[in-house]
A protein has these predicted regions:
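Acidic, Ser/Thr/Pro/Gly-enriched alpha-helical scaffold modules and adjacent low-complexity linkers
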Residues: 2-519
Length: 519
């Protein structure tokens, strides 16, 4: 590890080409409102990941942050025959106090985390020891505009060269002229095209980026929504153990419990994490989110190796890392995280999980990875009942031979409706205790879980609950809502609700008068 850190430090001191030494910084420095830096990483067979280009070159990353970015920008397991790029995302804790972040408008970004979008490419090269080279281009930002940042990297790398200094310089120069991000629509010129970005008032607005059921007139520059999920359920569902696992995962996440997504590639892992968090919106997941982690990651952020225990959702590809995280979580949190294995299976995706490993349609098996995996434990408690009509629709679409794009909208709309039904009784209860202060701000009386459960018992909920009898269903209902109200998610949702209501009453959420453009 010390050898690699020294290598990173030496690369940072290595002379840059003249045209990259002192980039012309247009004033104001608009790039810093959107991002921190571009980094090109190269996998050196002798020492591991190393930094090839840091642009702008004067960004004061700490050695520990550069090391974390380098390691996370490469797959831990990679097929040497892979010809297509991998696009994935990860986050690292900001341990670079000398980096000055900037964002004058809401959203202001995150001062504690760096959000990384990455394109990994593997190319044949007979001059290399392993006959191919591996490079990654990474965009580091303090804004979690994952889909938008992925699009920026796609435009920059589609020419066929992943480390072209001229492209880096041109991208930086154009972003330098963009107006700062703010709520609403932005039309942003970028390398010969217009990127249209829509920024919602809060990351947890549901159904971002989903087209309406009635097609509108085609826009010349289709919008990218800042917080829309990356990936698609049309792809992810083919790797699921069963369809009804969607409800298990939904329940785990809405109650702010821990989930580990295990996949063969960082792209599938990070896309699944993004898509899973989307289905519980507008409830913000209050745990730690790590779309992709490697063996060299900082585990204190998820309560391991000395950190404060926190719920988490993480994506990994390393079975040895899985065993380490599960053992540590069981030791510090007292419970095993739910494990979702995403892998190729024979036959169609079953509707529900078969508990026998020997059943002909069972997908309840260990992940097909070197070192094996850990057997999945069926959750001992479940409150929500699967919707049979939706499960049957998903099953029918999955059985079609042709490629489809209808699963994503179906799953996203169904779970958005389920979440709306779930939080409706809470909104109803809060409305009875709503007080407007003299300054016009919303204020709620102290929240009493027993009083709220009595309200749900009186007025009911539209959510379908498990149980053969009404008494069992009432028990499931009370257990579900009591668990939610005691979770971190409840407080993150309530904070979002109050903040948006106050901003709306102050006229800060009005419709924008037009698109913002680059200068």
């Amino acid at each position: 590890m010390d050898k690699i850190k020294n290598k990173i430090q030496s690369i940072r001191r290595k002379p840059l080409p003249d045209h990259l030494k002192d980039p012309i910084m247009n004033l104001p420095d608009g790039f810093r409102n959107w991002a921190v830096a571009f980094i090109v990483c190269n996998f050196n067979v002798d020492v591991g990941p190393e930094i090839e280009i840091l642009y702008p070159p004067n960004v004061a990353f700490s050695t520990s942050d550069l090391t974390a970015i380098c390691f996370n920008s490469f797959p831990e397991q990679q097929n040497t025959e892979t010809a297509e790029d991998l696009a994935f995302n990860f986050t690292v804790t900001n341990n670079s106090p000398d980096i000055k972040l900037n964002s004058p408008n809401s959203p202001h970004g995150n001062a504690d985390l760096f959000f990384a979008s990455c394109v990994f490419r593997q190319e044949f090269d007979d001059t290399m020891k392993r006959s191919f080279n591996q490079r990654s281009m990474v965009l580091i930002s303090h804004h979690n505009f994952t889909s938008f940042n992925n699009r920026i990297l796609q435009v920059m790398t589609e020419s066929g060269v992943i480390s072209d200094p001229t492209t880096l310089e041109g991208a930086h120069a154009q972003m330098n002229n963009w107006l700062p991000p703010s709520i609403g629509r932005h039309d942003l010129p970028f390398l010969g095209r217009i990127l249209t970005l829509d920024i919602a008032p809060h990351p947890s607005f549901p159904l971002q980026g989903l087209a309406g059921s009635v097609p509108l007139v085609a826009e010349p520059h289709p919008s990218i929504y800042a917080y829309e999920p990356v990936g698609s359920w049309d792809n992810i569902m083919n790797f699921m153990p069963c369809i009804t696992d969607l409800y298990v995962l939904y329940e785990k996440l809405v109650l702010c419990e821990s989930v580990i997504v295990v996949a063969k590639s960082p792209q599938l892992a990070s896309e699944a994490v993004s898509s899973l968090l989307d289905i519980i919106r507008p409830v913000p997941y209050a745990g730690v989110v790590k779309p992709y982690m490697t063996m060299q990651a900082d585990f204190r952020s998820i309560g391991i190796d000395g950190g404060t225990p926190r719920p988490f959702i993480i994506g990994i590809t390393n079975p040895f890392l899985l065993k380490r995280i599960v053992a540590a979580a069981e030791r510090t949190q007292g419970t095993r995280p739910h494990i979702l294995y995403l892998q190729n299976f024979d036959g169609p995706v079953p509707t529900r999980r078969h508990h026998s490993l020997h059943h002909k349609s069972s997908r309840n098996v260990l992940l097909d990875l070197p070192g094996g995996g850990i057997e999945v434990h069926t959750p001992s408690k479940r409150y929500l009942k699967s919707d049979s009509a939706t499960v049957n629709q998903i099953e029918s679409i999955l059985k079609l031979d042709s490629q489809t794009s209808s699963l994503g909208p179906l799953i996203r709309r169904h779970f958005a409706e389920l979440t709306a039904q779930f939080i409706a009784p809470i909104n109803r209860y809060l409305a009875t205790s709503n007080v407007v202060s003299p300054g016009g701000h919303q204020r709620y009386a102290s929240f009493s879980i027993p009083e709220f459960l009595a309200s749900v018992g009186k007025y009911g909920t539209s959510v379908k609950l498990r149980g053969q009898s009404s008494m069992q269903r009432h028990k499931s209902r009370d257990g579900l809502y009591a668990a939610f109200c005691a979770s971190e998610n409840f407080y993150s949702w309530l904070d979002m609700k109050i903040s948006l209501e106050n901003e709306a009453s102050a006229g800060l959420l009005g419709s924008p008068t037009g698109s913002k453009t680059g200068r």
